[in-house]
């Protein structure tokens, strides 16, 4: 995994589904106020569920010969697809483009397909995206959008070489998203509060600026261990719409097409093909290690005064201009993308209990 925030979630969502774990022992201590989220079932404007494409041994960036074509894979990013998109796609294009001449095909129009297509265009090549689904009907649209890798590998299943690949992808994505901050792409910086199982800095502290352990006087939460840092958050529907517009504006094409077998790719005119099919790579290319991990979200009406994110045993809350996201499930091997009302109710209830337990409010 990566950070404690969703370590609570990845542990099985038991804490979330049983309600907020607060003790009440800190209520008489000094307190720094924040505005609480107004968590009321009547404020839920939509519920969604998406499938994270999870591989225990980590995401795949690999070039394979494919008849008279070259096939470059770029998939399997678990819950870190938005976060790692630019870096992983850069690795993929660095594998595919050198020595290539002519147009390029990208399979898939989620965040990996769109960022791969943009990098292909930036390198001077014409590109066509072939996809079975367009935004907003892609898994990427459901993503919460915190720039922080989560749920995309198992510590005991990855190699040192893969860890180096991950670090390089994270570094490039981190720098690229900073250049995109602002309204156009829906990227903004926010302070993030986490209930933490540890109080020492992580190995990835460089991607968590201003990280520090807080005393009870520094926050309003009825929690024992809290850390705070800053990171970027992506309003994914806006981000994906703008990337799509960028691809089309630079002369790219997007065609609706479904591929049932790898042999179907042989009919494409392009000699270089990037596979950015996410969870679809399991069936299309027979990757049995790829498994779905379902995440469910309840989205509340926007609340402009909420200018922070928070996460812990109750779940996680990300504020966006299109709504307040409440999440916290990590359901392995569940293929159904229909939100479960009972689970959504528990997500809402756990967040209502958490924000209702603030020791002081702004």
For each predicted feature, which ranges?
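N-terminal export signals
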Residues: 1-2, 7-24
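Flavin (FAD/FMN) cofactor-binding and adjacent substrate-gating region
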Residues: 2, 49-68, 140-142, 172-249
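Active-site substrate-recognition segment that forms the wall
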Residues: 24-67, 76-84, 90, 111-123, ...
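Short beta-strand to alpha-helix junction loop
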Residues: 80-84, 162-168, 227-242, 338-339
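Beta1/beta-strand and adjacent pyrophosphate-binding region of the FAD-binding site
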Residues: 102-110
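Glycine-rich active-site loop/strand segments that organize a redox cofactor
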Residues: 134-169, 216-217
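A conserved short coil-to-beta-strand element within the FAD-binding core of flavoproteins
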Residues: 253-266
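Short hydrophobic core segments
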Residues: 271-277
